[in-house]
């Protein structure tokens, strides 16, 4: 059987991205429907304003940190419109390299085998959805790189640097703040398991929290001094009151559509955060009931992100890679059978396809399919994602209650988890 080594995997990943990138440039020049994401045009225009000593928020619909517009300044200095895409592709590849490095680190710490590392890393590096999103000029790959960077620092017990990067990732896009509680539990419990003093354990937790807050405060104050209230409103507050109902998979899609016709004083869209936050908090707290380990942290972050995206009032295709970065770690020791995994994948793809069909009829054919077509498609996608989330929650419980056990050997640290072969056999028989 052909085995693709690390070098081969990375080489193939680079070649695929080059091919997608070049095809995108060709399509933009020769086809009516453009390959480049419309958001990339927004980033590019905002960078143009910055290059001319103006605010990036002079560009309508720019609702991101100014750092993103600064990142694309070379577009207007070289000048080359597509240069920013190369930055996003490099972040995409760097994320894949981090996945490989983290799996290698886990190999020594948690006795991970080498046979599945390449396969797990390929989930990101060879994923056509991931490649398409970065080569089209979507900036999510930058955020994914930041998230895995601070997780890698925590894995290596570099808590100061990890906290700084965590703060930067929250500034870049606010949703990673939901990771604060699981990270706090992991840092505190990991050192408690190592029988360190309460002072040392508390100091590590303080170090992470302090460094995170320092970065957030400094960046927020600095950007506010440069761009004023527009920065706060467009970067953060907008995502609370936004009512986007186009290109939106969310089950709240129809609610937002009708809400957009109501007076601006309507508070309706703010309440859709409530079920989302309750579920995310509940998932975070389940970590308290189990021994702390880095694999468990990755599982919890995956579940949090999956639930956050599923219940979010705005859900687009690029949001999916928010949880795809954790999938290699979740699937490494999954107890989900191959058959069930295929069913989950088919359901996830099929319900997306049904929604995209309705979206095509609406956007390109001009048909009024908001109800029942688009509404039913959104409900179907939501229900399928809720079922898939339940499967992964069950899998996480099985992994940590049966698959992992704390090794009593004095030769290894007490937080090191190993595969419990008898437990695996027992669960397989039970299934």
From Swiss-Prot:
Region entry Disordered, spans: 410-431
Membrane topology: Multi-pass membrane protein
Span of the signal peptide: none
Pfam family, one: Mannosyl_trans
Compartment list: Endoplasmic reticulum membrane
Chief subcellular location: endoplasmic reticulum
GO BP term (any one): fungal-type cell wall organization
UniProt keyword Protease present: no
Pathway annotation from the record: Glycolipid biosynthesis; glycosylphosphatidylinositol-anchor biosynthesis
Keyword Heme: no
Residues passing through the membrane, by range: 5-25, 80-100, 117-137, 142-162, 165-185, 205-225, 268-288, 291-311, 314-334, 342-362, 369-389
Any GO MF annotation of the entry: alpha-1,4-mannosyltransferase activity
EC number, UniProt record: 2.4.1.-
Cellular component terms per the entry's GO annotation: endoplasmic reticulum membrane; glycosylphosphatidylinositol-mannosyltransferase I complex
Swiss-Prot/TrEMBL keywords: Cell wall biogenesis/degradation, Endoplasmic reticulum, Glycosyltransferase, GPI-anchor biosynthesis, Membrane, Transferase, Transmembrane, Transmembrane helix
PANTHER family: GPI MANNOSYLTRANSFERASE 1 (PTHR12886:SF0), PIG-M MANNOSYLTRANSFERASE (PTHR12886)
Function of the protein: Mannosyltransferase involved in glycosylphosphatidylinositol-anchor biosynthesis. Transfers the first alpha-1,4-mannose to GlcN-acyl-PI during GPI precursor assembly. Required for cell wall integrity.
Family: Belongs to the PIGM family.
Protein name per UniProt: GPI mannosyltransferase 1
């Amino acid at each position: 059987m052909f085995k693709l080594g690390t070098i081969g995997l990375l080489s193939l990943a680079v070649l695929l991205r080059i091919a997608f990138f070049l095809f995108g440039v060709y399509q933009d020049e020769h086809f009516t429907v453009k390959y480049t994401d419309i958001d990339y045009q927004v980033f590019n225009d905002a960078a143009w304003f910055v290059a001319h000593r103006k605010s990036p928020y002079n560009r309508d619909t720019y609702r991101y940190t100014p750092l993103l517009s600064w990142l694309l300044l070379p577009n207007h200095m070289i000048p080359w419109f597509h240069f920013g895409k190369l930055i996003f592709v490099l972040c995409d590849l760097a994320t894949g390299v981090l996945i490989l490095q983290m799996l290698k680190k886990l190999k020594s710490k948690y006795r991970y085998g080498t046979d599945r590392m390449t396969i797990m890393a390929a989930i990101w590096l060879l994923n056509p959805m991931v490649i398409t999103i970065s080569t089209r000029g979507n900036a999510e790959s930058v955020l994914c790189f930041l998230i895995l960077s601070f997780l890698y620092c925590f894995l290596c017990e570099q808590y100061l640097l990890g906290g700084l990067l965590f703060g930067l990732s929250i500034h870049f896009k606010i949703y990673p703040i939901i990771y604060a509680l699981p990270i706090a539990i992991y840092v505190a419990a990991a050192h408690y398991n190592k029988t360190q003093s309460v002072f040392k354990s508390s100091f590590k937790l303080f170090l992470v929290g302090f460094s995170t807050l320092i970065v957030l405060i400094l960046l927020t104050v600095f950007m506010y001094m440069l761009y004023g209230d527009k920065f706060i409103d467009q970067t953060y507050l907008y995502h609370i009151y936004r009512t986007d109902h186009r290109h939106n998979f969310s089950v709240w899609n129809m609610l937002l559509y009708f809400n957009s016709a109501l007076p601006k004083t309507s508070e309706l869209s703010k309440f859709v955060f409530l079920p989302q936050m309750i579920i995310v908090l509940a998932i975070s707290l389940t970590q308290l009931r189990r021994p702390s380990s880095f694999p468990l942290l990755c599982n919890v972050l995956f579940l949090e992100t999956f639930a956050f995206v599923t219940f979010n009032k705005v859900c687009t295709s690029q949001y999916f890679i928010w949880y795809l970065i954790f999938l290699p770690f979740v699937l490494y020791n999954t107890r989900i059978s191959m058959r069930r995994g295929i069913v989950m994948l088919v359901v996830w793809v099929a319900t997306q396809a049904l929604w995209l069909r309705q979206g095509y009829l609406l956007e390109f054919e001009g048909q009024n399919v908001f109800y029942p077509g688009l509404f039913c498609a959104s409900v179907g996608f939501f229900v399928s994602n809720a079922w898939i989330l339940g499967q992964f929650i069950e899998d996480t419980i099985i992994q940590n209650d049966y698959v992992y056990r704390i090794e009593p050997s004095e030769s290894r640290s007490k937080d090191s988890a190993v595969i419990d072969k008898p437990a695996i056999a027992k669960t397989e028989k039970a299934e």
